[in-house]
Amino acid sequence: MTQRQRGKSARHELGLRALKPALRAVVKAGRLTVIGAHATRLVIDSGSPGPSVAIKLHSAALPFKLLSRPSLALGEAYMDGSLTVEDGSIRDLLAIVTSGLDGLDELPIERLRAPLARIATRLTGNRRRKAARNVARHYDLSNEFYALFLDEDWQYSCAYFCEGCSSLEDAQAAKRSHIGQKLMVGEGMSVLDIGCGWGGLAIELAKQGAAEVLGISLSQEQLTLARQRAEEAGFAEEARFDFCDYRDLQGEFDRIVSVGMFEHVGPASYGSFFRAIEEHLAPDGVAVVHSIGRMAPPGGKDPWVDKYIFPGGYIPSLSETLSVVERMGLWVTDIEILRLHYAETLAHWYERFQSRREKALELFDERFCRMWEYYLAACEMMFRNGNLMVFQLQLAHKRDAVPLTREYLYAPRDQSAVPRDAGGNHLRCSCSARSRLLGTSNSEGVPPMRYDGSSTS
């Protein structure tokens, strides 16, 4: 071995030694073997059940990058090939390194970095032009790409795995139904869908009897397909889709729903978001906001996700969300926390993506596909092992806008769509049918896919 080779080997060995305390802190399940470029090895055995994974680091600098910015460095290393999984899968690796995330918080560098990240996040907001740019970057990738792993209704948000759901399609249909129960859409009502995606929920609400549904989005790709789907379903007049920022809305709506959009708003714009709901919701109206959240105090953004997946995005805590709702004077009539439902959803997406990976490579390059593998697997494990969850907020102007108890959420649809009294009369939630779509100012029961470390994808 030459002197230069010995120097490189020493740097790799030094890097692995520096990495060892951090790995011991976070690996609380399974066994991880880290191989340096010159065959130096580090083995971390948790002594607890879990996957056995071997990874190879192809750069002497990588251990130090992993220590300084773990999330960003790990994601980029996998994308670029400077970290390869020699035994197991990226999903296995992420299951191991997220098994003890509390230990990461105790490392000195994390104690220094976390407060700075929180301060920077407080300033995060998305003005109109920036919001449109950020949305386009993610959602305008290609409808053909999203079709590779989404269900047949194009639902790109957490499914609802109720008893009897045997597939992703079933669980996404259950999600639409569950949100519909909370909205209590009656015949002739007007509905606003903020961040309507590819139109699945809006079209479903039109089918349930809504006279007019306006879906708004900042993604041209989504809007094009949503309009096409409404036309094909025969509901093009009832379900309309516009390119519009929620801050530019006009009119009043009996029902307002927003699924998977609040994560893109940013703390500095929370007031604008809930003010829009307060101003555009009818006096007897009901709104439902469905969002990824963190079961922890407000924190920072994930640097890898912010750079590569959702620029400008931020996962809100329930506390910072509700404090803004309170200032708007809205009643929080129901809160539901979905704990593992998104982990199961992401597991389905990951398996579907892997099974159609060759198709993805026809659309994008290998680095892009590795990025999405990492994204789907990392998100799944953060719902399984981290502090992520989903919350659904039901909001209203009046305390009696919805029934006194939650039985109506689980009653057969024909009994709960519009609650009635003993005489068959509509209760408070029966807003009168008003055509207010005035346009815009600028045109847990089913056996789950539990992760047991057996994935070979």
Model feature map: region roles:
Residues 198-209:
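Conserved SAM-binding loop of SAM-dependent methyltransferases across substrates and taxa
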Residues 247-256:
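A short acidic, Gly/Pro-enriched loop at the edge of an enzyme's catalytic core
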Residues 284-292:
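Conserved beta-strand signature within the Rossmann-like core of class I S-adenosyl-L-methionine
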